[in-house]
Structure formats: C-alpha cells, structure tokens
Amino acid sequence: MLDNIQEYLGVVKAKLTEFYEKVFQNFVKSLFGKPSSILFLGIDNAGKTTLVNKLKSDSTDVYMPTHHPSTSYIEIGNLKAQVIDLGGHTAARLAWRDYFYDCHGIVFIVDVHDVERFQEVREAYETVLSLEKRAPVVVLMNKIDLEGHTPETAEADYQWKSWLSQETGIENQEDPERGQVVKIFYVTITSGSANSITGPLARAFKWLEAMITYNNKKESL
C-alpha cells in the first residue's frame, strides 16, 4: 500500500514538474520579440546542458556539430542560443573569438560548489569580457543548494557573496551608462522551483531581454 502511494506521489511530482517546465519554456519564448543570439558560457559541468534541457520544448532539437564537440545549438522562439564549454588554458579559450560575432547577450554559468576550479572560472570570465565588451552578461551562480542556500538566503548572505566575487572576479555592474552590464543571479537549475516564472532564473532572462532591448534602441538612435 505504501509503495503504491509513493509511486503515485512520484507520478504526480513528475507531472507537476513537466507542467511548470512548459510554463517556464513558454515564458522564455515570449520574452524575445526580435531574433536574439545568446551565448551560454562557462567551464564544463557548470550546468549549461541542464539549463538548455530545461529551456527546450519537445519540438526543439539540440544537436552537437561535428566540427567541435564542445558546442551545441538551440532555438526557443526568437532566442537563438549557442552553448559553449570554455575549458582549457587562456590561449585555448581565445580560439572561441568567432563565436562572439553578432552576440546580443551572454549567460555565464558558475558551479559555486566546485571551489577548486574558481581560478579557472576567473580566467574564463576574463576572457569572455575581453572578447565581447558590449553584450549584457547574466551570471548564474548555480548549485547554491549544495552550499545550503536558497535563492533568498543566498541574496541575504553578503559575506558569502563578497567571497564569491573575490574568488571568481565576477561582480555586478548594472549601469549601462558605465559600459557593459553584468548581473548575478543565485540559482539551483535542477530544482523544481527553478521552473517558476517569478523565480531567479526567470528574472535573469527577463533582465537579459530588457538589456538587449535597451542596447537595440540605443543603437537605433
């Protein structure tokens, strides 16, 4: 009897997760009114593939091009995303320069639990900023649950956030008049609550879309 109840609850949970994922997908799809090229960047195992799987709909294919196994592509409405691993040394990362052509926005993902690779994250992030100086950057500090945080407690933990910035070299810069804008969001991409259209992941895409729109209007003046 207990096994049947647990099985039923598991099915209900899976159905709810699927429903909320559909809602989240449609939310992101509705954001970008014009075609926008977005780069999903970060070192390997940061959570890029997990995020792409959360974003894509059943009708969207994610494929691996034959010329390089570290990139993949996805289209979600007007959002055209390239997912790129930025591993290796600085010299190797410079080879990614071509991917930044006609880039409208960047999603940079960090595994906050993988402390031993923060120096690699710092170097990758510095390379990204050196290759693209205009596009808005969303930074997703991912896997905060492994640090005992929710999005709310992470935002309130100023000491931890300051330490993260010191270790990774990543800081908020939200004034477009001062140059390239960067905004940090604290998330657990695998969490069911990450599908919420009011959660930090949704707010991250909404902010990115707003900054892309701002840049487009500024360029048209």
UniProtKB/Swiss-Prot annotation:
Per UniProt, subcellular location reads as: Cytoplasmic vesicle, COPII-coated vesicle membrane; Endoplasmic reticulum membrane; Golgi apparatus membrane
Q: What catalytic activity does the UniProt entry give for this protein? A: GTP + H2O = GDP + phosphate + H(+)
| Top EC group | hydrolase
Task: Please give, as recorded in its UniProt entry, the membrane topology of this protein.
Answer: Peripheral membrane protein
Q: Please classify the protein's predominant subcellular localization into one broad category.
A: membrane
Picking any one GO biological process from the record gives: vesicle-mediated transport
Instruction: Give the residues the record marks as binding GTP.
Output: 48-55, 91-94, 151-154
Pfam families cross-referenced by the UniProt entry: Arf (PF00025)
Q: What does the entry list under GO cellular component?
A: endoplasmic reticulum membrane; ER to Golgi transport vesicle membrane; Golgi membrane
InterPro entries for this protein: P-loop_NTPase (IPR027417), Small_GTP-bd (IPR005225), Small_GTPase_ARF/SAR (IPR006689), Small_GTPase_SAR1 (IPR006687)
Q: From the Swiss-Prot or TrEMBL record, what is one GO molecular function term? A: GTPase activity
Q: What is its EC number?
A: 3.6.5.-
Q: Which UniProt keywords apply?
A: Cytoplasmic vesicle, Endoplasmic reticulum, ER-Golgi transport, Golgi apparatus, GTP-binding, Hydrolase, Membrane, Nucleotide-binding, Protein transport, Transport
Its assembly, as annotated, is:
COPII is composed of at least 5 proteins: the SEC23/24 complex, the SEC13/31 complex and SAR1.
The protein's role, per its UniProt record: Small GTPase component of the coat protein complex II (COPII) which promotes the formation of transport vesicles from the endoplasmic reticulum (ER). The coat has two main functions, the physical deformation of the endoplasmic reticulum membrane into vesicles and the selection of cargo molecules. SAR1 controls the coat assembly in a stepwise manner. Activated SAR1-GTP binds to membranes first and recruits the SEC23/24 complex. These SEC23/24-SAR1 prebudding intermediates are then collected by the SEC13/31 complex as subunits polymerize to form coated transport vesicles.
Family to which the UniProt record says this protein belongs = Belongs to the small GTPase superfamily. SAR1 family.
PANTHER family from the entry? RE74312P (PTHR45684)
Protein name, per record: Small COPII coat GTPase SAR1
Encoding gene (name): SAR1
